[in-house]
Amino acid sequence: MRKNKYLYITLLAVLGFHQEAMAQAIASTPRLVVNITVDQLRTDYLETFMPLYGNDGFKKLLKQGKVFASASYDFTPVDRASAIATIATGTTPYYHGIVGTEWLDRQTLRPVRCTGQNNTPINILTSTLGDEMKLASSGTAQIYAFAPTADAAILSAGHAADGAAWTNLNRWNNIDYYAPVPLWQSDYTKTYAVETDINKSITELALSCIEKSNIGMDETPDLLNVIYKQGATPEESYKNIDQHLSRLILRIERRLGHNNVLFVLTGTGYSEEREEREDEEKFHIPTGKFNIQRTANLLNMYLGAIYGSAKYVEASYKNQLFLNHQLFDQKNINLADVLNRAQEFLLQVEGVRNVYTSNQLLTSESERLEKIRNGFCTEKCGDLIIEIAPGWKLVNEETHESTTQRVNFISFPIIFYGANITAERVLTPVTVDRIAPTIAKAIRIRAPNACASEPLF
């Protein structure tokens, strides 16, 4: 009898401890995740303009947050759309499918936007963090995204959000893909025009969301995505973003409490600074112009000399060449042989540093090719990827575009702040695909379905 009594007391103690631990776990789970992305954020500028900041924006995050000082994207090339999709999905374009803001449609041979003509998230091939939050909460989690552009808003929001909005000249655009636009959002975007200071308008809309939607007010974690843009000059941009960042953080903390909110801030890992006219020849710097259309024509002539006159190269786009698969099938020509011949030919063209074939990227296990493979998607990329020499200009005569090849590393941080996070500066290099699993761990849900990366902490 006494033995049973002791067993009963022990069970009560264990159950009590378990319930207390569960209560503490629920209490420590952030009610709101504020995922802030600063387009083209750079560590050098962030530090250079430190004297211009107030105490509650960048300075607060850098001093009181967990700062991963050396972040990068584990694929190339990186642009706004591919970067934001990677933040949302925790994986690379190889899996999530967003290889860029635009890509060439293989059927029409015309460029298409990553969100399509109707501005929807259907081109994201995997789940996003917001999608997993919806699944984990049986749909009760609230997910919003506000940005300067459609692609940034929609890719952040994911497949199952409650709302997303972006700026278009001096007015707001709402997405009605998910469901009817929430009434508070519809009223706001109809009432308030977008100001010249777009970041201010985005901040105002985000704060209106906090107040009108009751986001973050219950125990189910919600997600608010905010994307800021760069302005005319770096100095103006960083000072401007700091002011709005400060206001956003203070208002949200005042409403929800510091420990109930997890703020995450990072950048998009690339830079689109206007190229100044440089006198390379004067200083004997190796340079030149690589014309992608002329190269496509030369390759077509070369293949014609081997296989007979025909249109073997269907199109060129950026640094990619697209071959006519149907024609090779009709002629019963082995595509792998064609790719190898084309690669050998292109490597002899002046200004070409390297050439990668689709077969090579899909089958090779070389670590050297890993970043290029991670940025590749069979349905949306060319058969031949051309890497031109550093300093050379990639010229497109049809679009009159010209970009200079640079391989400079763009340093930017990942910062976590709030939600009982201890301040720390981590110098170990990390990749952005680890943000999503880190947030998922913090709010105790699964990471997105193509995310194989470990949480940062």
Regions found by a protein language model. Give the residues of each.
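Second-shell loop/turn segments in exported
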Residues: 42-48, 73-74, 116-121, 191-196, ...
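Beta-strand elements within well-structured catalytic alpha/beta cores of enzymes
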Residues: 31-42, 61, 87, 133, ...
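Loop/turn elements at helix/coil->beta-strand transitions in domains of secreted/extracellular proteins
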Residues: 29-34, 64-69, 95, 138-143, ...
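Bacterial Sec-dependent N-terminal signal peptides
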Residues: 1-28
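Secreted, luminal/periplasmic, and some membrane-associated catalytic domains
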Residues: 53, 70, 79, 101-118, ...
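Short, structured active-site-proximal loop/turn typified by the sulfatase FGly-forming signature C/S-X-P-X-R
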Residues: 46-94, 142-145
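Substrate-binding rim/cap in mid-to-C-terminal beta-strand-loop elements of soluble/periplasmic
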Residues: 292-333, 401-443
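His/Asp/Glu-rich, glycine-adjacent segments
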Residues: 92, 97-220, 229-231, 344-354
